[in-house]
Amino acid sequence: MLSPSIPALVKVMVFFLTWTCLWLPIAIIVAIALKWQPPQPLGNKKLPLLASLYLIVPFILWATTWIESVSLADWGLFWQPATLISALLGLGLGIVSLAILFGLQLALGWIQLQSSEVETKTSEKTINPWTSILNPSTLLILLLALWISATEELIFRGCLPNLLQQDYSIVIAAAIASFIFAIAHLIWAPKETVPQLPGLWLMGMVLTLARVTDGGSLGIAIGLHAGWIWGITIVDTAKLIKPSQKVPEGITGIAEKPLAGAAGILLLLTTGTLLFMMQK
């Protein structure tokens, strides 16, 4: 184990510096292959770059467990049926919470359904939102959401908080890890992410509470995170909804991003309250 005299924040910085140094050469090769260069919008080129970043994670985490003399179980990843059940519970909670969020906004007239158009045999076009939801690609998106959420939860709700708790209380450690979690999203779309930073930080805190609620396991947190990623990605890619302009975008979400709006913040607070009430 690294000397206890080494500050936890220094360990965290070394973690991310190592990750960045290993990823940059790969990212440059991927970017050249995709013919992308900053500051061009990433668009559909984000996924290959994200994949290259997260494929390095197992090595970084393995090295960290070896250096710190800990196991994945110490970070909340338990290889047992209870973890799968918790993940399914979290996944359901994430999907249902988003359904309630968008359903209430539709009922209040704050947003409008903007469904895909399906041409009938008589050449008439009808609006059918289910063609966007019940699509084979949604399963792929769900699998990607589970991969992303498992990776991020193991890092930001597992590894980092445990490192930080060597010097700080669990609350302060969670707050710092959630801040890093929020800031890390700036790498992909800085302009869109800035209004979401408070929401992303709060999301990190809620997901930390999910781990506490699950007795230290990351199961609920992974499922909950995946449910949110999956639901929001489906809505975004299929362009299912649009603001009605009846309320300021600060309510529904700046640039149509739920985490950048009061409604999304309320969703996180409500979820956090529910998790607190569920604590084992």
Protein language model annotation of sequence segments:
Residues 92-101, 119-188:
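Function-critical hydrophobic alpha-helical transmembrane segments in multi-pass membrane proteins
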Residues 23, 27, 31, 108-109, ...:
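C-terminal membrane module of polytopic membrane proteins
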Residues 69-78, 154-162, 245-250, 280:
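Membrane-interface helix termini and inter-helical loops of multi-pass transporters
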Residues 54-59, 140-144, 167, 199-212:
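Small-residue-rich segments of transmembrane alpha-helices in multi-pass membrane proteins
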Residues 1-5, 154, 161-172, 209-220, ...:
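Helix-coil boundary and interhelical linker segments in multi-pass alpha-helical membrane proteins
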Residues 185-193, 215, 219:
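Membrane-interface helix caps and helix-loop-helix hairpins in membrane proteins
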Residues 40-56, 136, 140, 165-177, ...:
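Membrane-interface starts of transmembrane alpha-helices
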